[in-house]
Amino acid sequence: PATTDYLATPTEVPNKGTVILIQKWNGLTRRIKETADAFAAVGYVALAADLYSGRIGLNRDENMALVQETMQAPDQIIRNLNAALATLKARPDVPGQVATTGWCYGGSIALSFALGDGNCDGTAIFYGRLLNDPEVLKQVQHEVYGTFAGLDRGPSVEQVSAFVTGLRTAGIDNDIHIYDNVQHGFWLHVDRDLDRNQAPAEHAWGRLLNYLDRMLSPLKTDSKDA
């Protein structure tokens, strides 16, 4: 990976698989790196991809400028992720199966990446721009995880419902959950309202680990090789 990416590897626990983390709109922040460390602590090789080459937005205008710059070349984003994926798969300590997860801007990119050529074995979305066209969504080749906020307006509950309908129509299994009475960003920023955010954030994390276990289980690799 590029030197600005952040790699966390398991030390005292078995290697369960690999997760690529895709940042929010403000860049590869300390919180995203902490999340990569949390994945490593439970047994995953975790690469937090830096799509801004070391830059971090400090306010809304800077964040928007960085997003617009990268979204002018969406194909380059996918190429960068594929390059990171290839580098990871070449490592001797990385199992063959890889999932992506992203937040907001990163959630949208994770979903787009899942529409590619099947390199990805799992996709976990925390909010983000969604799709609802079954003809597009049927390109996804695995179950999709999603965590959303009931008080969010982007995506709204109605948009999440349309996404779920699109997945079901396309025949894509999904583990989608809308948490009532929390705002956009509740999972990464639990401390903003601990009383309200902590319980749903912990529940979403448990669901995510169960999802990754289903998608990246070594038993799946063994069965393919049998």
List where the protein language model places each region:
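Serine-hydrolase catalytic machinery in alpha/beta-hydrolase-like enzymes
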Residues: 1-93, 187-190
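Short alpha-helix in the alpha/beta-hydrolase fold that links the catalytic acid
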Residues: 35, 156-167
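Alpha/beta-hydrolase fold nucleophile elbow
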Residues: 92-103
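Gly/Ala-rich beta-loop-alpha elbow adjacent to hydrolase catalytic centers
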Residues: 102-106, 110
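A conserved short beta-strand
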Residues: 119-129
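Short beta-strand/loop motif that positions the catalytic acidic residue
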Residues: 140, 146-148
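Acidic catalytic loop of the alpha/beta-hydrolase fold
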Residues: 151-155
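C-terminal catalytic histidine-bearing segment of alpha/beta-hydrolase fold enzymes
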Residues: 168-226
